[in-house]
Amino acid sequence: MAIKAEEISALLRSQIENYESEMSVTDVGTVLQIGDGIALIHGLNDVMAGELVEFHNGVLGLAQNLEESNVGVVILGPYTGITEGDEVKRTGRIMEVPVGEELIGRVVNPLGQPIDGQGPINTTKTRPVEKKATGVMDRKSVDEPLQTGIKAIDALVPIGRGQRELIIGDRQTGKTTIAIDTILNQKDQGTICIYVAIGQKDSTVRANVEKLRQAGALDYTIVVAASASEPSPLLYIAPYSGVTMGEEFMFNGKHVLIVYDDLTKQAAAYRELSLLLRRPPGREAYPGDVFYLHSRLLERAAKLNDDLGGGSITALPIIETQAGDISAYVPTNVISITDGQIFLQSDLFFSGVRPAINAGQSVSRVGGSAQINAMKKVAGTLRLDLASYRELESFAQFGSDLDEFTASKLERGKRTVEVLKQDQNKPLPVEHQVLIIYALTKGYLDDIPVVDITRFEDELNHWAESNATELLNEIRETGGLPDAEKFDTAINEFKKSFSKSE
């Protein structure tokens, strides 16, 4: 079969016309040194600060130290497969994490990869992990309450949407319990919760996830877990990943609650990275920018103005102290950044006062304007009553004779402490809180034995659910305080049926 010359030339012409020259230029470098999750790279002359670089085995790294002749990279994953002389290439992108509704109900690592064994997360939207905080003019004053369901907090140190409220205390004083209870109380409140576990044991993270699942709270919660077994870079970026996921909801007009549990471990991970990168150490061996580490994170919590949709991120950072020392470097830094703190005391915890909140050292600098009117009115004198009780309590230990007024103050104080106690995983709706605190401050509990206070409260709540629904609904729907007459009638009626212990 003869092939004509014209056919050959036409075939060649079509091939040449369809030919596309694909030439890609990749900036590459070479690993000079590797160890402890840090790689020293020669080359990569045009790499950006915070840019992702890719090693030959697919593991990613984050460019941190940009020096004259080399680049210090922290490795975001296992580094045992990387050796000296390996090739490293730029990706041209800064670190991003997946965001969106698809993440709700899932447990992910700080890179946004699922670790709960429930398959891939089908979202294509991403956001950069490092982002400038919302500007001054885009914000609005905190004016909406965020109910925690914990009497001692909602009455004494109220939290508003868009606030940063620090939870601080020694280990084993109930810090995580307060955070988890607050998440449980957001059910049916239209709030999306993000729980960031930093440097905790895998078993602890699993227990908290199960607690959330059993209470049905995973339906509106994302868990970002960087456990103690993970490399330091993942512990360092975990909070930023969490708040990035939250910002997606905030900018869509939704309300977000984010818990960082805890930032002490994040600061320790950052200290480790900084020392390995040979950055000069400062106080307590932390690098000079450890304040900025936390301020740029916590400033991303905000209440947006109405033009931007009125969304919010409320942050509850947790800090662990050593022997109650809140004057250490990281605690003082975070106290100065946040809008108040809830201080948990181990002495109170071990004496059975749980949550072990020290009312004297706990404060909410902006939450007062967000507190509902009903609570503001009934709990107005509570802090003062507690303070005077603590003072009189130490005075009464000397066993001197007490006048009638002092004795009544002490008795009221004992009942106040008892009312503010609360079991874990049992958040209380705000209308029930107002009811029991009203009964306390108006003297209705003065004739109830201290041992009966908890039972009195439980039975009052059950009784009110069926016999004082109008009263509860009025508080829930309007936020205002009903007539004193309605309260007095309801409480007196219940007291007739309540039997005191002998």
From Swiss-Prot:
GO cellular component terms, semicolon-separated: plasma membrane; proton-transporting ATP synthase complex
Entry keywords, A to Z: ATP synthesis, ATP-binding, Cell membrane, CF(1), Hydrogen ion transport, Ion transport, Membrane, Nucleotide-binding, Translocase, Transport
Task: State the source organism's domain of life.
Answer: Bacteria
Binding sites annotated in the UniProt record for ATP: G169, D170, R171, Q172, T173, G174, K175, T176
Q: What is its main location?
A: membrane
Site label Required for activity, positions: S362
Signal peptide region: none
Q: Matching Pfam families, A to Z?
A: ATP-synt_ab, ATP-synt_ab_C, ATP-synt_ab_N
In alphabetical order, the GO MF annotations are: ADP binding; ATP binding; proton-transporting ATP synthase activity, rotational mechanism
Q: What is its EC number?
A: 7.1.2.2
| Reaction(s) the record says it catalyses | ATP + H2O + 4 H(+)(in) = ADP + phosphate + 5 H(+)(out)
Q: Where in the cell is it found?
A: Cell membrane
Q: How does it sit in the membrane?
A: Peripheral membrane protein
Subunit relationships: F-type ATPases have 2 components, CF(1) - the catalytic core - and CF(0) - the membrane proton channel. CF(1) has five subunits: alpha(3), beta(3), gamma(1), delta(1), epsilon(1). CF(0) has three main subunits: a(1), b(2) and c(9-12). The alpha and beta chains form an alternating ring which encloses part of the gamma chain. CF(1) is attached to CF(0) by a central stalk formed by the gamma and epsilon chains, while a peripheral stalk is formed by the delta and b chains.
Function text: Produces ATP from ADP in the presence of a proton gradient across the membrane. The alpha chain is a regulatory subunit.
The family note in this entry says: Belongs to the ATPase alpha/beta chains family.
This protein is called what?
Answer: ATP synthase subunit alpha
Taxonomic source organism: Staphylococcus aureus (strain Newman)
